[in-house]
Amino acid sequence: MTSLNDIRSTFLDYFGRQGHAVVPSSPLVPRNDPTLMFVNSGMVQFKNLFTGVEKRDYVRATSSQKCVRAGGKHNDLDNVGYTARHHTFFEMLGNFSFGDYFKEDAIRYAWELITKDFGLDKARLYVTVYHTDDEAFEIWKKVGVPEDRIIRIATSDNFWQMGPTGPCGPCTEIFYDHGEHIWGGPPGSAEEDGDRFIEIWNIVFMQNEQFADGTMVPLDMQSIDTGMGLERIGALLQGSHDNYDTDTMRALMEASAHASSTDLDGDQNVHHRVIADHLRSTSFLIADGVMPSNDGRGYVLRRIMRRAMRHAHLLGAKDPLMYRLVPALVSQMGQAYSELGQAQALITETLKLEEERFRQTLDRGLKLLDDEVAKLPEDGNLPGAAAFKLYDTYGFPLDLTQDALREQGRTVDTDGFDAAMAEQKAKARAAWSGSGDAADATIWFDIAEKNGVTEFLGYDTEVAEGQVLALVVDGARVDKVASNQDVIFVTNQTPFYAESGGQVGDSGTIRTETGVLHVTETRKVAGVFLHVGQVTEGTIKVGQGASLSVDHERRRYICANHSATHLLNEALRWAIGDSVVQRGSLNSRDRLRFDFSHNKPMTADELAQVEAEVNDLITRNTAVETRVMTPDDARALGAQALFGEKYGDEVRVVSMGHHAGSGKGLDKDTYSIELCGGTHVKRTGDIGPFVILSESASAAGVRRIEALTNQTASFYLSEQNERMGQLAAELNTQAADVLDRVKALKDDRKKLENEVAQLRRELAMAGGTSAPEAASVNGVNFHAQALSGVTGKDLAGIVDEHKARLGSGAVLLIADAGGKAAVAAGVTEDLTDRLSAVDLVRAAVAELGGKGGGGRPDFAQGGGKDAANAEAAIAAAKTVIEGV
């Protein structure tokens, strides 16, 4: 049987032989496209090539693209597990031409691949063309498809548009006939929705540009975009019409069945299908840098996770299940996607943690859903308010509730749910509103196309000469700028580092023969460095020569923080394990911030170990080395990379420190090796002192460390030392003895507090108001007393002393705490079978302006707003005793 891995390789190898660049899949998180939640097709990473705003060193490409469809317009989540071809995660095989070949070659390549390399029966293949696309019709005839199997389609199914305006063009699709034993008709027929004729490949001919008025003109650059789902063609080549019968999906489902000790087929099958699919999407999303959260992409990830976890619950799994399936996934797909193996520890830890948390509420949430359903008529649907309560209180996404109700033939009032969710949706929309930059990205692409990308000189120098290529004010290009104008300044080369990889951009000064620019920040778009600042003297014109000078002191501090971050990252891995993965960072002038995956607070000992190890590496003052190499060579050395980052053919590798047990580097003794494009110190000693300020939660499963280095750390330590001296003087001791002195003071205070409490109890036992002596009520010795000068905390001990004195009986005490009442009651063990202290407290509290009260039959506590009603409260408690 041909495996999915073999099919993927066959596809890519075929187009590689046809001169296509084999381009790796992009991460699932789109770059520079805030309108798209996840990559959902093969063309996404090539979008700027199709629109002409970007150029690369190839004009034809092929890829197997990771895709997720679980939100927004393309949302397959509800159907996953119940149909043969719906997935949240799938791979899209594609070949692309950017102004190179067009219809004839695209059709010829497709036909040759599927009939020769894949060996599909030509007699079972049908094709569709757009009804006016005579050219495609004739090409299909030319390659050998009979006219009666070339179907003209007049609907939008065979006409592709990027949007209301922009590139568009007709499509041609290839269908496979599974045979008469399966219901359905050919495309365009009344029975086309059946499963007999299945589309396996879509080929888009981008040949026109559409304008807002509906007119179309031919594109100057005509292109090809194709897509073929790997799972769909895999099912066909493996003799099935169900994607879940493919070898990869079957292996994951078998792993699910084994881990849950359940049958693979029968009633359990749908659960295993959901788990297998969702395992792929969640694992790849985590590997590409998405973590579960309550908004944005992280919320979609959490929804997918929790849907799978509910199906694991329905299988009867008593313990977390998903994380135990990760090795099976890595075994199936890790060779094609190395990021799975690299992120395996993080994926495993994240899945386990999320499932442990969700299982704590799942049973309660499902019980609440059952209670709500029990109130409904036989064919009633769940009100939106109830569904929102599940979401708001128990973290149940709407689709999880819908999924649970689906099995009962019920639905949810989604309009009611949407109304309850309006505020959250508004916040979510605001979060996706984009960066708000005045200048459209096309400006920078135009500059890059005309002048090339900016050459960065800042690894070797902080001063350089350049030429002014562009000036941008309020989103528009201008020829010159005058004093006090804010401007974005572009040169052909620069020593200024542009913000990226967690490192802030440089600031400094740029001078021309006629003016001076103060640079406050440096950014980068499409390889163009943007110097953002204000003209402080004279005027500056496009075409002038420029002298660029980076703020040396600021850069020095930033470099120290960035290099320290590398050492911190590795020290954390040594201290708490390989599950530590960088989740974010900020390296600024003043401090560094490092976010990392970890599911609990670090201990004081762990933090001390990390801080000491980083400082030890700093004091060794070893050289910081940088080399440029291929990503594969870097990984072979053990270099750490950021999950979700896409790297080019060459990467910059930063190495520092030595550790005999590291196993990394050429000599297997390098402490830290990371792929990094930032600027760093020359030697570790240049970092200076390293001080951890804090460790805290940043998000679920993510911790954050903030730290100082260099002179900032020295100032901090000096300030702390000064404060310690002041504290020692205040305590009349030496700095080294401050801790012992504080402990002694705390012990003295505790002793005095105990003595005061004992005195209050003795005073309370000796007097007070309202029946200082016990009275017999219904045969029960009852001591009731309103006290002053005691606190609520004192009452428990006083109640116990009165119970001991009575031997058999009940006690009620009310303390006046600044006008409010603290109440405590006790009943001796011999009476608790017929009298409860809880009932006494509740009766008393009701008279004191309070509610409730609780505890055990032998002791209970409560409180009220008005201690002045103590007499009425005692009388109410007495009534309770009289009634037993």
Swiss-Prot record:
The organism's place on the tree of life at top rank: Bacteria
Catalysed transformations (reactions): tRNA(Ala) + L-alanine + ATP = L-alanyl-tRNA(Ala) + AMP + diphosphate
Keyword entries, A-Z: Aminoacyl-tRNA synthetase, ATP-binding, Cytoplasm, Ligase, Metal-binding, Nucleotide-binding, Protein biosynthesis, RNA-binding, tRNA-binding, Zinc
EC number: 6.1.1.7
Cofactor note: Binds 1 zinc ion per subunit.
Cofactor list: Zn(2+)
InterPro entries reported for this sequence: aa-tRNA-synth_II/BPL/LPL, Ala-tRNA-lgiase_IIc, Ala-tRNA-ligase_IIc_anticod-bd, Ala-tRNA-synth_IIc_core, Ala-tRNA-synth_IIc_N, Ala-tRNA_ligase, Ala_tRNA_ligase_euk/bac, DHHA1_dom
SUPFAM superfamilies referenced in this protein's UniProt entry, alphabetically: Class II aaRS and biotin synthetases, Putative anticodon-binding domain of alanyl-tRNA synthetase (AlaRS), ThrRS/AlaRS common domain, Translation proteins
Single GO BP term: alanyl-tRNA aminoacylation
Cellular location(s): Cytoplasm
Sites where the protein binds Zn(2+): 562, 566, 676, 680
Keyword RNA-binding: yes
Annotated Gene Ontology cellular component terms: cytosol
Sequence similarity: Belongs to the class-II aminoacyl-tRNA synthetase family.
Domain notes: Consists of three domains; the N-terminal catalytic domain, the editing domain and the C-terminal C-Ala domain. The editing domain removes incorrectly charged amino acids, while the C-Ala domain, along with tRNA(Ala), serves as a bridge to cooperatively bring together the editing and aminoacylation centers thus stimulating deacylation of misacylated tRNAs.
Protein task: Catalyzes the attachment of alanine to tRNA(Ala) in a two-step reaction: alanine is first activated by ATP to form Ala-AMP and then transferred to the acceptor end of tRNA(Ala). Also edits incorrectly charged Ser-tRNA(Ala) and Gly-tRNA(Ala) via its editing domain.
PANTHER family assigned: ALANINE--TRNA LIGASE, CYTOPLASMIC, ALANYL-TRNA SYNTHETASE
Protein name in the entry: Alanine--tRNA ligase
